[in-house]
Amino acid sequence: CVCLVILAGCSHPADTNHKEAGAGTGSDGKPSAEISSMPTKKPEGETLAEASPEPAIVEEDWSEYFDGRNGAAVLYHASDARYRIYNKKLALSRRSPCSTFKIISSLIALENGIVDSDHSTRRWSGEQFWNESWNRDIDFREAFRTSCVWYYREVIDEIGKKQMQQQLDALRYGNCDISDWKGRRNKNNSNRALTGFWIESSLKISPKEQAEVMERIFGEESMYSWETQKELRQVMLTKRNKKTALSIYGKTGMGAKQGEAVDAWFTGFAEMEEDRIYYCVYLGRIEGRNISSDKAKEIAIELVSDYVKGF
């Protein structure tokens, strides 16, 4: 089944009905490997002769990767300009981005000098958090790797509402709704150091939109500096296969309600020489089947790796 897709911009509802949920986070391992130096920012002064047609959607049966789990997958292969999607209904449904939003907050903070990756340590308040790795002074790279919510809560507050809204509008990031800035809708957690609009609150995005945003950040038409992209690549690097020249970059995210995970993500991009794939894998909870961001990550890596083999 092939159909054309029309992309919509952000809307700003003053208030929307959302399920209230708590938050958990996934953590990413980072191999010590050299980062690709292929720039993606369009040279200054270059213009497009005409607008490109909207990419088509091709529906795929990737059920074997999910093994009965409730999930969706989106791959956008830049060279053939098609979205390959498993479970289209779920892939077009918006959910909380949770810790995948650390890609966006890192992007904005790095681009605007709010975070300097070489001088990025923030002091721990002394409060004991559930994740032991957060109970100390922590720098940007470690905060990204461990999904340290208190660190990013501070960074996002320094970015501020006005700049955050402008950036999300420019990226067309889901519903772009930051109205619940402090995350008060999140009744599962009253600690405001660990809540925010991006954690089971007002901000929502679909798996397809996640892949689209990755292309806007790391694609040829990116409006972000190569230096910022390079810093993000360093913390997002998840797996590198020297034999196939495949590098996979991504970030986990997980949100919970009443102690049980309800949203699990892994999103990012993969690179092979001059080619690039933007992807997202999402898992949603169903009765009797646990989900995790680690499982979403495992599925994404396997799916992307197998897709590349078929080139």
Mark where each language-model region is:
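Sec-dependent N-terminal signal peptides of Gram-positive bacterial secreted proteins and lipoproteins
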Residues: 1-13
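Structured C-terminal helix/loop/strand segments within mature extracytoplasmic catalytic/sensor domains
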Residues: 10-62, 94, 157-160, 211-311
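A short, well-structured edge-of-sheet supersecondary motif
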Residues: 54-88, 267-270
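Active-site SXXK
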Residues: 94-119, 143, 210, 279
